[in-house]
Amino acid sequence: MSVISFPPSRFSPSEAHQIAKTLYGFEVSVKVLDSERDQNFYLKREDGKEFVLKISNPAEDVELIKLQVASLKHIANFDSSIQVPSTIQTVGGEFISRHNGCFIRLQSFLAGHFIKDIENPESFLLEEFGAFLGKLDVSFREFDYPDLKRKWIWDVRNIDFLKSHLVYIESESDKAVVRHFIANYQLNIVPNEKYLRTQYIHNDGNDYNVLLNDNGHISGVIDFGDMAHTFLASELAVAITYLILEEAEPETKIKSVVQGFQSVYPLRDEEIESLIHLVCVRACFSVVTANYRKKLFPENKYISVTEPYAWTFLKNFADKELNNFKIY
């Protein structure tokens, strides 16, 4: 059973409080955080120290959680200027524990504002955003976890997932839009895959996961649950996708983010040319997955929060000749 088709755990705040006390020896206040496929609780200790209690989806593979723990440790050791959550050990010295069929971790809480909170981010901030993602991927370039180069649903190369889940989209015209971008991917990306470097990437550097400090500068990143070993260019493609979904003319924003990334981790010409194709495919994953999961979990409104914007974006770009779209 996949984590996207299995319901999340249903721990109550009082149970989260008890877990914190039993496993970590903490007396805390508890607040529920929004989450898509697992459960997250904000914890605040009596001394003011803040944490996030992460309770995995019951279908989650523990090896994937170990991957996340290892990656956070690696980044912190490789480049201390990149703020990422640290994983807290239990009173028994464990980084991951199991409770009622779910794997549990406690992470430090990263304070800050989200890029999403900035109504019209200026070019310098978008360049800084791109440069931050570049730094993150430079650190990942030295990271390897060979047993888990998985075929993840959110890996843009997983076109078979899009094809097999089109049935969950009711509108034939909407299906046709997704098919258009699948065909576009197969025509423009597949023949050039040998030129596109692969490595581990965060794979979800959207404007809800990248943090700003009080001075308005990029400070850190959270939520490593979608990590994948895939195209390096996908890191930028994911970030760009969520930045421009609501933009009628996104070229300026795109160029700023790409310029920042290029200043730290230069992409090849073929990778630059692939970006707009990967952006459109990522938006397809957003709408297809949303339609699939909201049929399974209609009560979870978090699932489809970006879907309307993604459809507008895709229908707009379906009329464009992507190879003529100058992204940088």
Over which residues does each language-model region extend?
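Conserved NTP-binding catalytic cores of kinases and kinase-like/nucleotidyltransferase enzymes
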Residues: 1-89, 213-214, 326-327
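ATP-binding pocket architecture of kinase catalytic cores
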Residues: 46-143
